[in-house]
């Protein structure tokens, strides 16, 4: 029950923030908004404000939308079946204005994450764990490579690392491919190649809930705490957001290239489970979960897939460069292709969720 409640609350928060970004910029640019909906299907409750916007909560809490006057949100074209006041429609605005309206949704998701991370950095400070090995897991890739307690990791794949998080990040970015670690041991410095080992994450009832990989090293538990102000907190929050986005993009590219398994894609059941776990762990963990999910929502919406915000941004850029709208037939084909891609991702994610529930 907590997972279901957590899922509904989490999705509602993220969708509201995302659509509110579209709404705010549309209103700022004097584009009329007809509806602001959380959920799909039959309206459960709603109110119309003095500007004529219908704010409503619908039966199926799996998303939401902002309906802009004279603009069909599913096809991204002017609705010719009804009379419209061209002065306040989406397409009456310049390419830059329309680009701003579309981009505002994903960007406000990023802004939410930065605000949450900033508050954590300002309140708790920055914690760094030096990249010094405290222990090596038996029979792990690290042990086979000859790593020992007390070794300091200087570089991973020729990139300098200043703390253990950097080590984890670089190894994650490289996926299941081998990583080259530069190790400092006493006065000696040498390199080792390590290929991560796949491990199964199991539920206490022995049900598999996912896969990950490790090289088998444990950090020496000597964290360094540093207090930082608001400016430093913002910078750290931005860096954290960029790091998470980079890891996500790398994972997506590896899945496309076939070097990373598709069973890592989680769907609504996974989100519900993680929502419930984070809520049960307290407000701090739940806020961090919201921030992580908000980054992923913003990033995925920016992917150049037709029907997503990113695909529509490509259409606007095409118009800005060529001076003409994309060919309607070509546009419709691309929209249908985009819908198929999204449908396939939904099927894969739900299949993974079901498989992880029973196997």
Swiss-Prot record:
Its main location: membrane. The keyword Zinc applies. The keyword Phosphoprotein does not apply. PANTHER family: MEMBRANE METALLOPROTEASE ARASP2, CHLOROPLASTIC-RELATED (PTHR42837:SF2), REGULATOR OF SIGMA-E PROTEASE RSEP (PTHR42837). GO terms for molecular function: metal ion binding; metalloendopeptidase activity. SUPFAM superfamilies: PDZ domain-like. Its EC number is 3.4.24.-. Keywords: Cell inner membrane, Cell membrane, Hydrolase, Membrane, Metal-binding, Metalloprotease, Protease, Transmembrane, Transmembrane helix, Zinc. The chain crosses the membrane at residues 101-123, 286-308, 333-352. GO terms for cellular component: plasma membrane. One of its GO terms (biological process) is proteolysis. SMART domains: PDZ. Zn(2+) binds at residues 18, 22. NCBIfam families: RIP metalloprotease RseP. Belongs to the peptidase M50B family. This is Putative zinc metalloprotease RP161. It comes from Rickettsia prowazekii (strain Madrid E). CDD domains: cpPDZ_EcRseP-like, S2P-M50_PDZ_RseP-like. Residues 104-188 form the PDZ domain. Its cofactor is Zn(2+). The active site is at 19. It is a multi-pass membrane protein. The lineage of its organism: Bacteria, Pseudomonadati, Pseudomonadota, Alphaproteobacteria, Rickettsiales. It is found in: Cell inner membrane.
């Amino acid at each position: 029950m907590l997972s279901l409640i957590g899922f509904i609350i989490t999705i509602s928060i993220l969708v509201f923030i995302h659509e509110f970004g579209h709404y705010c910029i549309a209103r700022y640019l004097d584009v009329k908004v007809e509806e602001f909906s959380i959920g799909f299907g039959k309206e459960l409750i709603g109110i119309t404000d003095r500007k004529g916007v219908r704010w409503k909560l619908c039966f199926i809490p799996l998303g939401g939308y902002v309906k802009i006057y004279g603009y069909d949100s599913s096809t991204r074209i002017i609705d010719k079946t009804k009379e419209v006041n061209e002065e306040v429609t989406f397409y009456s605005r310049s390419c830059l204005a329309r680009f701003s309206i579309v981009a505002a949704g994903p960007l406000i998701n990023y802004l939410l994450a930065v605000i949450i991370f900033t508050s954590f950095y300002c309140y708790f400070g920055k914690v760094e764990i030096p990249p010094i090995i405290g222990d090596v897991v038996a029979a792990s890739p690290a042990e086979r490579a000859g790593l020992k307690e007390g070794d300091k990791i200087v570089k991973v794949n020729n990139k300098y690392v200043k703390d253990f998080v950097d080590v984890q990040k670089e190894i994650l970015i490289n996926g299941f491919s081998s990583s080259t670690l530069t190790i400092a041991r006493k006065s000696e410095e040498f390199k080792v190649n390590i290929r991560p080992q796949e491990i199964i994450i199991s539920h206490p009832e022995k049900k598999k809930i996912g896969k990950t990989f490790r090289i088998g090293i444990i950090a020496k538990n000597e964290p360094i705490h540093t207090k930082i102000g608001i400016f430093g907190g913002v910078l750290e929050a931005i860096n954290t957001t960029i790091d998470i986005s980079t890891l996500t993009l790398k994972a997506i590219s590896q899945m496309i290239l076939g070097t990373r398994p598709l069973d890592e894609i989680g769907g609504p059941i996974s989100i519900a489970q993680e929502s419930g776990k984070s809520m049960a762990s307290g407000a701090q963990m739940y806020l961090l979960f919201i921030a992580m999910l908000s980054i992923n929502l913003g990033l995925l919406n920016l992917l150049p897939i037709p029907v997503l915000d990113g695909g529509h941004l490509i259409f606007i850029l095409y118009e800005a460069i060529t001076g003409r709208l994309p060919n309607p037939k070509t546009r419709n084909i691309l929209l249908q292709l985009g819908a198929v891609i999204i449908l396939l991702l939904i099927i894969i994610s739900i299949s993974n969720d079901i498989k992880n529930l029973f196997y």
